[in-house]
């Protein structure tokens, strides 16, 4: 009869010890799941990167009294994304041709000259050079 009593005591202690330990992680898991779902919703909203703010700032610098519609803003945003993608492809192609592992400001400048036409490329190069010198000086 002594072995039965010995078996009952550890068995009685183990479930009593496990039950509170199991309940705490379950409660913690529920909190993390609820918090995780809220964080996921916030992350999906934050991941949308647009240039709308910057387009609007430039518009107000050029024409302070003129607004822009949502469709026009979407078109401008896709236009900027398209131009950046073309510049990135061209600069990466130039780096590959020259057997260089990195894209420097020189590749970007050459890509701008190749992608953008005429006077627009000249203005873009001068503004880019000005921005790079301002960045390196500070």
From Swiss-Prot:
Residues 1-45 are annotated as: Disordered. GO terms for cellular component: nucleosome; nucleus. The modification N6,N6-dimethyllysine is found at residue 14. It is found in: Nucleus; Chromosome. Residues 1-38 have a biased composition (Basic and acidic residues). Keywords: Acetylation, Chromosome, DNA-binding, Isopeptide bond, Methylation, Nucleosome core, Nucleus, Ubl conjugation. Pfam families: Histone (PF00125). Can be acetylated to form H2BK6ac, H2BK33ac and H2BK34ac. Monoubiquitinated by BRE1 to form H2BK143ub1 and deubiquitinated by UBP26. Required for heterochromatic histone H3 di- and trimethylation at H3K4me. May give a specific tag for epigenetic transcriptional activation. The modification N6-acetyllysine is found at residues 8, 13, 18, 23, 29-30. The modification N6-methyllysine is found at residue 4. There is a cross-link at residue 134 (Glycyl lysine isopeptide (Lys-Gly) (interchain with G-Cter in ubiquitin)). One of its GO terms (molecular function) is structural constituent of chromatin. The keyword Transmembrane helix does not apply. The modification N-methylalanine is found at residue 2. Its main location: nucleus. The modification N,N-dimethylalanine is found at residue 2. Core component of nucleosome. Nucleosomes wrap and compact DNA into chromatin, limiting DNA accessibility to the cellular machineries which require DNA as a template. Histones thereby play a central role in transcription regulation, DNA repair, DNA replication and chromosomal stability. DNA accessibility is regulated via a complex set of post-translational modifications of histones, also called histone code, and nucleosome remodeling. Belongs to the histone H2B family. The nucleosome is a histone octamer containing two molecules each of H2A, H2B, H3 and H4 assembled in one H3-H4 heterotetramer and two H2A-H2B heterodimers. The octamer wraps approximately 147 bp of DNA. PANTHER family: HISTONE H2B. This is Histone H2B.8.
């Amino acid at each position: 009869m002594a072995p039965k009593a010995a078996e009952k005591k550890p068995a009685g202690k183990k479930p009593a010890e496990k039950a509170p330990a199991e309940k705490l992680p379950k409660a913690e898991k529920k909190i993390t799941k609820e918090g995780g779902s809220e964080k996921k919703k916030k992350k999906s909203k934050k991941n949308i990167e647009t240039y709308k703010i910057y387009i609007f700032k430039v518009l107000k610098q050029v024409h302070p009294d003129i607004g822009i519609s949502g469709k026009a803003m979407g078109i401008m945003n896709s236009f900027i994304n398209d131009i950046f993608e073309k510049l990135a492809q061209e600069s990466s192609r130039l780096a590959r041709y020259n057997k260089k592992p990195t894209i420097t400001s020189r590749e970007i400048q050459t890509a701008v000259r190749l992608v953008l036409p005429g006077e627009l490329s000249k203005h873009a190069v001068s503004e880019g050079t000005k921005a790079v010198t301002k960045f390196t000086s500070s």
